[in-house]
Amino acid sequence: MEKIKFTSVDQYFETFEGKTLEKLIELRNYLKQLIPEAEECISYNMPAYKLNAVLVYFAGYKKHIGFYPTGDGIKQFESRLTDFKYSTGAIQFPLDKPFPFDLIKEIVNYRLAKTQIKNK
């Protein structure tokens, strides 16, 4: 089976159902409200938001939503990620738990500040 090359977030979402789709939509709506000036796009074949540079990526899985704020976005908040599985560039938000929107907001704001500094 050939892997789909997504061209829009809506097309990406069409491949999901149930709780995963609900959580993807919930995160998308939150990010659109949080950073309305950011462009929604597909990057690395997953949804992303960019403003000057990519701020965050996210992806759906069977048991979690992957959130990818790049390596520095993880490192800066590592001490607050102990309730989640995480790696150098990814955080796993379980489908059966509410999103930590306060933490997501702080990470996105940090990424906004970092990308503005890089582009000056």
Where are the predicted features?
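Charge-dense, helix-prone N-terminal extensions
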Residues: 1-120
